[in-house]
Regions:
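N-terminal Rossmann-like or analogous alpha/beta NTP/dinucleotide-binding catalytic cores
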Residues: 1-116, 203-216, 255
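Conserved nucleotide- and phosphate/pyrophosphate-binding catalytic cores
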Residues: 47, 51, 55, 184, ...
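Short, histidine-centered active-site or binding-site loop motifs used for metal coordination
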Residues: 7-11, 41-43, 184, 188, ...
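A secondary-structure boundary/capping signal
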Residues: 40-42, 74, 179, 222-223, ...
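Gly/Ser/Thr-rich beta-alpha loop segments that engage phosphate groups in nucleotides
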Residues: 15, 20, 176, 199, ...
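Active-site cores that bind ATP or allylic diphosphates and position pyrophosphate for catalysis
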Residues: 96-223, 228-234, 242, 267
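Hydrophobic alpha-helical segments in the ANL/AMP-binding
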Residues: 27-28, 61, 179-183, 404
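Short, low-complexity, intrinsically disordered N-terminal peptides in bacterial proteins
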Residues: 1-3, 128, 438-439
Length: 439
């Protein structure tokens, strides 16, 4: 049987690293097993769901390279839900309830006050129906046998259904809650594996019985540990560190996906070139049960290491017009992200603002301009210029190199000066040294 996974976001906001991680794990598991990855838009909440977020989610997944084989929307499947709901109703597996939220809350407090679990108490079949009150609907759990399923990450999961409330599946206004439509979709789409956060474990227990009530075998479940921000690394909430922010910052998708695929597992986080590489090593047996700590700085480090090894052909179409392979190979060891390239290219071929130097530093760069003007310019220009300045001024180390770097590049640090000086050319180098000496 072919593996089928699904990612089921609600179009009420943009993707953040938490649900990107869930999407990635579903994608990688399907890819590793030659299966199908489905995007299911859970848009039953008509008030909060928007077409804009629907489009943005699909655009973000496309940017990440997590392209689904199929896209379905729950808002287009209400007829299917209605038909299956009526089948369960006829079988006595869903039933009407008439309590108000206030009545339910009062009963919950009473049970807790008695030291009892706040489990919903079913009403007698002959209980009178309140007049002029519409019902909500609950799924009737089978209390006669325990709920047991094997979780690919957490191992055997066992629940006593008597300690679970019959879950509400439909509101008074006829709108759907999450649990039942999700099961109906998974049956219809032949989903074989449900991969999601550990906060859904109890949902999976109830849903296991829903699958069986519909005459279907429950899928395999994998409940992964939740993602949390590494302490002290970022003041923002995890949810704000999402696709829009990452795209704006120029993070390479594969750098983010690399980190999200490996954190919380026993595998080291090392740069990879493609999703294929991540899929090969993806295995739920490597996942731990402790919270997975996400550190944005780790993404930045992986992104930089990725930059330092990217071939020119891999980035040619994303670089400014006229960018050369020589420029790329010279500058890439200093790039943190691709967006840094244009500014460094200006150092080679554009204009910079002359730096503010001390009196002694201005005298040094004035001498450097005179030396540079007399050189036969080559790949050895930087070495020849600094050797001559050491001999004539007696300066060395930072006292010599730092003012020259500032004057020639406008930067405190950067790539090796020999390559920069050779690439920017004699005329530009002399002009910059003279400008810095006069400021």
């Amino acid at each position: 049987m072919s593996v089928v996974t699904r990612f089921a976001p609600s179009p009420t906001g943009r993707l953040h690293v938490g649900n990107i991680r869930t999407a990635l794990h579903n994608f990688l598991f399907a890819k590793k097993h030659g299966g199908i990855f489905i995007l299911r838009i859970d848009d039953t909440d008509r008030e909060r769901s928007t077409a804009e977020f629907d489009s943005a989610i699909r655009d973000d997944l496309d940017w990440l390279g997590l392209k689904p084989a199929q896209v379905v929307r729950q808002s287009e499947r209400f007829d299917l839900y209605e038909r299956e709901f009526e089948r369960l109703r006829a079988a006595g597996r869903v039933y009407a309830c008439y309590e108000t939220p206030e009545e339910l809350e009062l009963r919950r407090k009473v049970l807790l006050g008695r030291g009892l679990p706040p489990v919903y108490e079913r009403k007698a079949a002959d209980e009178p129906v309140p007049e002029a009150r519409k019902p909500h609907w609950r799924f009737k759990l089978d209390h006669d046998r325990p709920i047991v399923f094997h979780d690919l990450i957490r191992g055997e999961q066992r629940f006593d259904p008597k300690l679970l409330s019959d879950p509400v599946v439909r509101r008074e206004d006829g709108s759907w809650l999450y649990l039942l439509p999700s099961v109906i979709d998974d049956v219809d789409l032949q989903v074989t594996h449900v991969v999601r956060g550990e906060d859904h474990v109890s949902n999976s227990a109830a849903q296991s019985q829903m699958f069986e009530a519909l005459g279907a075998k429950p899928p395999e479940f994998a409940h992964e540990a939740l993602l949390v921000m590494a302490e002290g690394k970022l003041s923002k909430r995890l949810g704000s560190y999402g696709a829009p922010h990452l795209r704006e910052e120029g993070v390479e998708p594969i750098a983010l996906l690399d980190v999200l695929a490996r954190i919380g597992t026993s595998l080291p986080v090392e740069p990879v070139e493609s999703l294929d590489d991540l899929a090969v090593s993806f295995d739920f047996s490597t996942f731990g049960r402790a919270p997975a700590h996400f550190d944005p700085h780790e993404v930045e480090l992986i992104n930089a290491r990725l930059m330092h090894n990217l071939l020119f052909e891999a980035v040619r179409d994303r670089l400014p017009s006229g960018a050369s392979e020589e420029d790329w190979l010279l500058l890439r060891p200093n790039l943190q992200r691709l967006a840094d390239f244009p500014a460094w290219r200006d150092v080679l071929h554009g204009e910079i603002n002359p730096p503010e130097l001390s009196h002694d530093e201005r005298l040094l760069v004035k001498d450097a301009a005179a030396v540079a003007e007399k050189l036969a310019w080559s790949g050895e220009a930087w070495r020849e210029m600094t050797e001559e300045l050491k001999r004539t001024t007696g300066k060395k180390g930072r006292e010599l190199f730092h003012p020259l770097r500032l004057a020639l590049t406008g930067r405190e640090s950067g790539p090796e000066m020999a390559g920069l000086v050779a690439r920017m050319g004699q005329e530009r180098a002399v002009r910059r040294l003279e400008a810095a000496a006069k400021r």
